[in-house]
C-alpha cells in the first residue's frame, strides 16, 4: 500500500498535469519509472518522520480535499525536497509535484475511495479470469465501501454500447466492455464463497507481512502452499526487467483515450468521473 501512495501521486497529480500539456505519461512506462523512483528514494530516506508526513498528507488531501489539506501536502513536499538528507535524484523527482498545484481542481475530482486497491485489483482479476475462461462470471461482494461507492461506474463499463475491444500496453492489455456478469453485494455470513475468499486473503496477508518472531516458520509453510505459487495480480514495485520491457511496449489503443472517446456510450450519472 505504501508503494501505491507514490503510484497515485503520479497517477492523480503528475499525469493530470502532463495530460493538460499534451503528454501521455503512460507511453514508455514514464509513470512506472517515476512511481518506482519516488518509492525507492522514500524508503531509503533517513528522515522517516518527514517522509511519513508527506505520505499521510497526500492521502489526507485525496480523502478530504480542502484548502488546508492541499496547502499541507504541497508545503510538506517542499520540506522534503529541501531536506538536508534528500538526494539529488529524489529532489528531481519530487520537483515534478509542485507545478501540479495549478491543476489540483481537475486532479481531485475523484471519490474518496479512489486510492483504495479494491476496485483496480477486482478489475484486473476480472480481466484475467475472462482471458482464461471467456466466461463473464457473476460476482458477489461483501459489504465493501469501495465497491458500493463504485458499483454504478463498474456497471457502466460493463454495459458500454461498443463492440468488445482490446486496449492497453503489453501484458496489461484488457478488454471493454468490462467482461463481468452480475455484480451484487451479499452478506458474507450467508455466502460460503466470500468466507473462503476471506480465509485466503487473511492467510496471504499473514504470509506477506514482514516479521522475525516465532511465527516465521508458519509464514514459510503458507507461502509453500500450491495456491500461493501463482500470484500474478498484485500492485507492487516493479522490477528493472519489467520496466525495461514495458518501456518498449506500445498500445494500438490507449485505454484512457478509448474511454474518453466513447464516454457518450457509457450510461453513468454525470456526477461520476471516468
Task: Walk through the language-model features, giving the residues of each.
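Phosphate-ester processing/binding pockets and catalytic centers
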Residues: 1-274
